[in-house]
Amino acid sequence: MNIKLFLAALLLPLSAAAQTFDFDLTKHQPAYSDATGYGYDFTAAPDLPGQHDVYFSVKVPDGNYRVTVTIGSRRRATDTQLRAESRRLLVPSTALKKKELRTYTFTINKRSPYITDKERVKINDREKGSLDWDDKLTLDWAGKNPAVSRIEIAPDTTATTVFLCGNSTVVDQSCDPWASWGQMVTRWFGPEVAVSNNAESGLTAGSFLRQNRLDKVLAMLRPGDYVICEFGHNDQKEKGPGAGAWYNFSYNLKQFIDRVRKAGGRIIFCTPTQRRFFKDGKIQETHGDYPDAMRAVARRENVPVVELHDMTRTFFETLGVDNSKRALVHYPAGTFPGQTRELADNTHFNPYGAYEVARMMTTGLKNLGIPVTRYLTTDWKAYDPAHPDDFRTFVWFPSKFFDNVKPAGN
């Protein structure tokens, strides 16, 4: 075991301590426990070549962390896909020869429900115990023959944070086969940027506010950080006095604008992704006035807008009625262990679809001239939804977590 742990002030509480970790994974490491505060999590140490879906966790306070990971092995050829927390993609499937090592650095945001000693986010039962809301920073590597040789973790106070607010089309979905663009967009940002995905399935702009989720974002936000909001899917289902696109929804969006700007943040809207609802080969509008209401508020308040609504329409229509299912959770019974019934969902993306929408999102930001796009990775390329990636060549290794229950807000 080769671990270095430096505490800037041993007498300070954990939340105030600066920590640096260096783990040599070519040597024995323990199973995770609260007592050790680090180790292999959920699965045993990867003693056998070919073992896939390995987790390693470190107990750390809330904040951003600069993480450097070396993949590969001196003993064998490897194929590794690297993810963080709840399946946030960091490194796509990467094949390396025996003795070939490759090092990557990125910045990962870790958070808990706590805002202050007395205030916390009102997370739901499904979120409790998830990797996005616990007291650990977790890395996950999978593949045909994955290997990680070294992990270095240090607090980071310099990265720009991009906070995501939204619903099930944005959230870090905890379980396969569900996925959202928020957990794929991490693939395209360098270590100068951390993505903090605060979205949750079933939320409206109003419930996001009522559950103290924006309070949590603002507690972490520093001047110059970004807040990206995608709402509309669930807002259109609200009933009661004031419900509708042009009153409650517009009013709630204005609250986001005012509060983020008051805190020194930069706010961006993105219109809701389309549902797969075809008629005569064309996607039909299912969101009513909500995309237009978001655009109207954005024009009035000078908020940049990424048009995911338009881009996903083109994407679905390009794939066509049948192949568009390949981007969503459409799987016959028996595709996954324990899956006893067919999954057919025309709202929620699978990893391929989420990856494509993440490419749309980064392209939209780039086209708007948003300054944070200067930190896109060197292999990033602009995306045209009229020419999507081939779903047959997309590689994703399922995690050990599977759920056949549709996300809230379907």
Regions found by a protein language model. Give the residues of each.
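Sec-dependent N-terminal signal peptides
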Residues: K4-S15
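A short tyrosine-centered beta-strand micro-motif
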Residues: G63-V69
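Low-complexity, Gly/Ser/Thr/Pro- and Asn/Asp-enriched, turn/coil-prone segments
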Residues: Q19-Q51, N145-E152, S168-V171
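Short, surface-exposed beta-strand/strand-loop-strand elements in extracellular ectodomains
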Residues: F56-S57, I71-P92
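Alpha-helical cap/lid subdomain in secreted, periplasmic
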Residues: M1, N212-T378, F397-N410
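Serine-esterase "nucleophile elbow" of acetyl-processing enzymes
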Residues: L139, G143-E200, L214-V227
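Conserved catalytic region of serine esterases and O-acyltransferases that act on ester linkages
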Residues: Q19-F21, K27-D34, V58, A95-L101, ...
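Short beta-strands within extracellular/lumenal beta-sheet-rich domains
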Residues: L48-G63
